[in-house]
C-alpha cells in the first residue's frame, strides 16, 4: 500500500502543471475597473505590496493579480506557457536570474517600451528586455544569543574555522536547498567560482549536518527561534527587515566578498496588458520606486543599493561598508550554471559533501 500511495503521489506531481502551484492575491481597482495586470513573482507579497499600491494609485482603473510561486516553479510555468504561445503573466519578476536570462534568450520576453535610467549600472540590464530592480546582498545571519561577539565570523575563512566545532553546531546551521531553490543555486554556483574557500566551506556544512531550506525566511525563522545558530547565504533584504522586528538576529556582510543579487523583471512576450507591465517596471526604477523598495521592505534598488546599505548599522559583525560587494551581472554568462552537464556535476558534488557529513 505504501508503494502504491508513493507512486500515486509521484504521478500527481508529474501531471499537475506548475501554474497550479501558484498562490494568487487580487488587488481590486480603486476606480472603475478597466484592465488587469498579472504579476508572476517569487517575492513575498509583504515586500512588494507597497510598490503595487503606488502603481494602483496612479493607475486606479487597473486591478492587479499577484501570482506568487517558488522560483523554479515560476520558471517552469512561464517557459511552458511561452513554448505553447499561451498567457501566464504580463510581467515576471524573479530572483532566479539565470532562469530569467534564459527566458529572454528563448524569446519569451519583448523589449521595454520605456527608456532605462541613464545611471543604471551596466550589470543591471540585458538586451533592453531584462532589468534588475533590486540590490540584495547574500549575508550570514546568526543568533546573538548563540554566539559571543568575539566569535562572530567576519568572512568565510573565519566561518570555516568556527564550524570546526562540530559537536556544538551539528544540525544548527541552515542554508538553501540548492536543488529546489533557484536563488540558492546561483549563490552557491557563484561561490564556487569566486571563492577559494568553497571546498572547505562545503565540507564544513556537510560535517555539521547543515539543514537545508527552500527559502531565506525559513532560515531566518530558525535563527530567530534559536533552532539554528547560523544561516549562510541568506537574502539580506529579508534578514534586514526581520532584524527590525527581532534584535536577536545578527547580520554579517562577509568582508572577503558579498554577492549582491538583483530581482530581474521582464515583460512577457504573450502579455495581455503590456502597457501596465511596462508602467510597473518603469515605476520601480523611479525615485518613488527606489524609496518604496529601499524602505521597510529593504529590497533596495539597483540604482542606489550600495549607498543605502552603507548607511545601515547591523549592530554586530562586519558592516555593509566593510563588505566588498560583487553584484551578479545579468548576462548570458549566467547560462553556464544551467548547462545540464555542469549542473549535474555541481549538484553531485553538493550531495556528496552532505552525504559524507550526514547532512540533511
Put a short name on every predicted segment:
Residues 22-101:
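Early extracytoplasmic/lumenal segment of secretory-pathway proteins
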Residues 42-49, 87-88, 94-224:
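Extracytoplasmic ligand-binding site segments that recognize negatively charged/polar headgroups
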Residues 139-146, 187-189, 261-274, 292-293:
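A bilobed periplasmic-binding-protein/Venus flytrap-type ligand-binding module shared by bacterial periplasmic
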Residues 268-330:
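Mature extracytoplasmic/periplasmic domains
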Residues 85-94, 212, 229-234, 250-251:
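Paired acidic/hydrophobic, glycine-rich loop segments that form the ligand-binding mouth/hinge
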Residues 98-102, 224, 228-248:
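A ligand-binding cleft/hinge motif common to bilobed small-molecule-binding domains
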Amino acid at each position: 500500500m505504501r508503494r502504491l500511495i508513493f507512486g500515486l503521489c509521484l504521478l500527481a506531481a508529474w501531471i499537475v502543471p506548475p501554474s497550479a502551484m501558484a498562490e494568487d492575491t487580487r488587488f481590486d481597482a480603486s476606480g472603475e475597473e478597466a484592465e488587469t495586470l498579472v504579476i508572476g513573482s517569487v517575492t513575498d507579497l509583504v515586500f512588494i505590496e507597497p510598490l503595487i499600491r503606488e502603481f494602483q494609485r496612479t493607475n486606479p482603473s487597473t486591478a492587479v493579480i499577484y501570482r506568487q510561486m517558488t522560483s523554479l516553479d515560476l520558471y517552469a510555468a512561464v517557459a511552458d506557457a511561452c513554448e505553447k504561445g499561451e498567457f501566464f503573466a504580463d510581467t515576471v519578476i524573479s530572483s532566479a536570474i539565470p532562469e530569467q536570462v534564459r527566458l529572454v534568450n528563448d524569446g519569451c520576453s519583448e523589449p521595454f517600451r520605456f527608456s532605462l535610467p541613464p545611471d543604471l549600472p551596466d550589470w543591471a540590464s540585458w538586451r533592453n528586455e531584462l532589468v534588475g530592480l533590486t540590490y540584495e546582498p547574500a549575508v550570514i545571519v546568526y543568533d546573538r544569543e548563540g554566539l559571543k561577539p568575539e566569535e562572530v565570523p567576519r568572512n568565510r575563512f573565519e566561518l570555516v574555522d568556527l564550524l570546526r566545532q562540530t559537536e556544538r553546531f551539528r544540525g544548527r546551521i541552515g542554508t538553501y536547498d540548492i536543488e529546489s531553490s533557484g536563488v540558492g543555486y546561483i549563490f552557491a554556483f557563484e561561490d564556487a567560482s569566486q571563492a577559494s574557500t568553497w571546498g572547505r566551506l562545503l565540507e564544513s556544512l556537510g560535517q555539521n549536518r547543515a539543514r537545508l531550506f527552500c527559502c531565506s525566511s525559513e532560515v531566518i525563522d530558525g535563527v530567530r527561534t534559536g533552532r539554528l545558530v547560523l544561516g549562510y547565504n541568506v537574502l539580506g533584504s529579508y534578514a534586514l527587515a526581520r532584524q527590525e522586528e527581532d534584535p536577536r538576529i545578527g547580520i554579517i556582510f562577509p568582508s572577503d566578498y558579498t554577492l549582491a543579487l538583483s530581482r530581474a523583471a521582464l515583460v512577457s512576450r504573450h502579455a495581455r496588458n503590456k502597457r501596465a507591465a511596462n508602467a510597473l517596471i518603469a515605476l520601480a526604477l523611479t525615485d518613488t520606486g527606489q524609496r518604496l523598495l529601499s524602505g521597510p521592505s529593504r529590497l533596495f534598488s539597483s540604482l542606489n543599493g550600495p549607498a543605502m546599505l552603507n548607511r545601515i548599522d547591523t549592530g554586530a559583525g562586519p558592516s555593509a561598508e566593510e563588505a566588498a560587494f560583487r553584484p551578479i551581472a545579468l548576462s548570458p554568462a549566467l547560462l553556464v550554471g544551467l548547462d545540464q552537464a555542469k549542473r549535474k556535476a555541481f549538484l553531485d558534488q553538493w550531495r556528496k559533501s552532505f552525504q559524507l557529513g550526514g547532512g540533511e
